[in-house]
Amino acid sequence: KSITKSEEVLDNYLDKQDGVYEVKENTDGDLEVTAPYQTKRLIVESDQVKDTCGASEVYVNEMDHETILQYDSEEKTEEAFQQLSRTYSSCYPDKVVSIEDSTMGLPLSQGGENGQGTYSWGSDYMGLNELKKQAASSGYTRRVTVAVVDTGIDTSNVLFAGRKVSSQSYNFFGNNHNVQDTFGHGTHVSGIIADATPANVELLVLRVSNNEGKSSLLTIKTALQYAVSKNADVVNLSMGFIDVNASLYDYLDSTIDKAYNRGIPICCAAGNGEGGSKGVDV
């Protein structure tokens, strides 16, 4: 297709910036800019990569038969991708995942209990207060662990009073056990779960984002694997990908299948990207 004047101007501008950018026209006729190599990381679904094309760090995951390659610049990442993708059909850049901020500024408690034993209108609307009563009257006290793969948690919120947060909670972005939420989305999601469930439901909080709510495909998969290894009963994901393709779905599918085969359901967001978003809910 011929390049429009707007695309030419944008391309010329981006050529002067650091990094590697791609300009595409979407179905609405708007120009979209993506940075496909911004993580400076490639995922190759093979544990037999002979030539890493100058990677500064190499991690071979023999269990999942994959090699993770880290580079020093986006330009080097692009060059390596062009070369490696000719040899390995399943080779792709690690993608950025956006944890939507549509809940920012919304109060979790909505001003206090609504008289139905819950704080959020959603729990009330779905009758989850009745479910909590049934669970309490049944005498079912076995601990149920829900892994929340998100931005962390602020346990000072009233919804978490008396709620157990697992000591095995982990921050995959900081590589430590500090899962304090600095973005807000994870607290909102965990708050809904706490509001809608009885006290025997424990939260395994897995922080996978930076302070701006950005994560990556590899980080998400690592957190999912961790949740499965810690025998979580349920896993919750509420986030969206930008510029997805079938190979990215396949990459997560292998881990999701392992969870499924162990009887661990994974709950995903619907409508998390809102009406005008170009992202795809996960």
Features from the language model and the residues they span:
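Substrate-binding/access-modulating region of protease and related hydrolase catalytic domains
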Residues: 140, 208-282
